[in-house]
Design a protein with these regions (language model features):
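Charge-rich, well-structured scaffold segments of protease-associated domains
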Residues: 4, 9, 20, 64-216, ...
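Active-/binding-site microenvironments in catalytic and ligand-binding cores
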Residues: 25-27, 81, 195, 228
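Active/ligand-binding-proximal structured segments within catalytic/core domains
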Residues: 13, 20-71, 145, 182, ...
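A generic "binding-loop/recognition-motif" signal
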Residues: 14, 196, 277
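His/Glu-based metal-binding/catalytic segments typifying zinc-dependent metallopeptidases
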Residues: 21, 30-32, 218-280, 387, ...
């Protein structure tokens, strides 16, 4: 049984959440910064992800190799990731090595060096990462899609930055952003595993007792840049003309979620439409028709905006047919909701998956962190199961109807333009009828 996590606020504003799991032999420590790419001005675009690369380069006492050796010695692991709203770096260690994890956190948070030579080295690594992403059609399609639907809002920019923005970052900018955002009052430390709340609170006190070095009082922790709600996503049909064997197709609707219940329903709808090999769209488009290798749905949820998207990599000549299936299946949900038998199957799957995740300290840490960052609270496995079981067919119908009737969908296709005039005219007619906008053709 997963009991709710316990929370503590330190004098300097740092928040600690602890999930006690005495049955485990490990501990996961995650440091979450409430800052991501949406909080970057144009001059700092890409700096959050840049810091993800720099954070484990070490400090005054331990360099990058020292950190790696310390973690390897105990058979542990460490990693980091950046999203549009958060940055996380985390350690996975034997439960007896909690003190090591805290010492490493202190080193990288209190005394980072961000040496110029390391910045130059990681700059080249990130430029290669950007190039690699552009060469991955699926990732590139999603980046272009986010840019289209969020317009000029920072949420629409990709997380990595571009060549010009990365070349424009320097040590001064990296430190400025770090000191302004990597502050105790703007962070959450999540600990999950074989550790008591009192022990975790005692060990982490070194991070919570006083202001951190170079974080001067009165310096605003989080500027308002990027914090204005992005608003409803922009409808449209964008066709990016790119010669390839496969077409990449995204169909999405603005999908407001106003409560935890809505998030659960959204996840259920995602599972039903494109959550795996038993999903409706996977069965229809891949298994029955053989049009695609990859097809899935994705509930993209932020603090103040949500998008429900469906993606497929299909044969170029099947783009319009695929879009019609996407539109038809989503429209069908507005009339009938998810059939009771399918709903029961998905509810079982979600509950069992949740229970299986409790056997891993890192999964548990991610779960309690997400709950804290989005809802300021944690839920037990019993409460989660109860919430999932409470969803009825009529609930899925109501949310699907809210999404579909709330505005026109957004569509992006990365593919060669159809050669036949008649086929292109059919695509244009579909755009006008479904999205309420004219089809926009762009060069790759």
């Amino acid at each position: 049984m997963w009991h709710p996590a316990k929370k503590h606020h330190y004098p300097n504003g740092l928040t600690l959440i602890v999930d006690e799991a005495p049955e485990l032999k490990s501990v996961s420590i995650g440091a979450w910064v409430k800052t991501g790419s949406r909080h970057e001005s144009q001059d700092f675009w890409g700096v959050s992800h840049f810091l993800e690369h720099m954070i484990f380069k070490g400090g005054k006492k331990r360099g990058a190799l020292d950190i790696s050796k310390a973690v390897d010695r105990v058979g542990g692991d460490f990693n980091a990731f950046t999203s549009r709203e958060h940055t996380c770096f985390h350690f996975y260690l034997p439960a007896l090595e909690l003190k090591l994890g805290v010492a490493l956190l202190k080193e990288i948070l209190f005394h980072p060096l961000f040496a110029t030579k390391e910045i130059e080295r990681e700059r080249q690594v990130i430029l290669q990462e950007i190039a690699m992403t552009r060469e991955s059609p699926e990732e590139d399609t999603f980046d272009r899609f986010m840019e289209k639907i969020f317009g000029k809002h920072p949420m629409g920019r990709n997380i990595l930055g571009d060549k010009d923005s990365i070349l424009g970052l320097n040590r001064k900018k990296v430190f400025e952003f770090f000191n302004q955002h990597y502050r105790p009052e703007n962070m959450v430390i999540a600990v999950s595993g074989n550790v008591s709340f009192e022990k975790a609170k005692r060990e982490l006190f070194v991070l919570g007792k006083s202001p951190w070095p170079n974080r001067k009082a009165g310096l605003r922790a989080v500027p308002q840049w990027g914090m204005d709600p992005p608003g409803p996503t922009l409808p449209g049909f964008w066709w990016i003309n790119e010669t390839s064997e496969q077409a990449h197709v995204i169909y999405a609707v603005n999908a407001p979620v106003k409560s935890h219940k809505d998030r659960v329903i959204s996840t259920i709808l995602q599972q039903y439409l494109g959550g795996g090999m038993s999903s409706v769209l996977f069965d229809e488009i891949r298994e029955k028709k053989g049009w695609a290798y990859t097809v899935y749905a994705n509930a993209i949820q932020f603090l103040d905006a949500s998008v429900f998207s469906i993606y497929a990599g299909v044969k170029a000549e099947r783009v319009l047919d695929t879009l019609k299936v996407f539109h038809s299946e989503l429209a069908k949900l507005t009339r009938t909701g998810i059939p009771r038998q399918d709903l029961k199957r998905i509810q079982d799957s979600l509950i069992y998956s949740f229970e299986l995740s409790t056997e891993n300290a890192e999964s548990r840490m991610m779960t309690i962190s997400t709950s804290e960052l989005f809802f300021k609270r944690d839920i037990s496995s019993r409460e989660y199961a109860k919430g999932v079981r409470a969803i009825k067919t009529i609930d899925t119908q109501a949310l699907a109807k809210l999404w579909v009737q709330g505005g026109h969908p957004s569509i992006l296709v990365l593919s060669a333009k159809p050669k036949g005039r008649a086929e292109w005219e059919r695509v244009k007619e579909f755009s006008s009828r479904i999205t309420g906008t004219d089809l926009e053709l762009e060069a790759f």
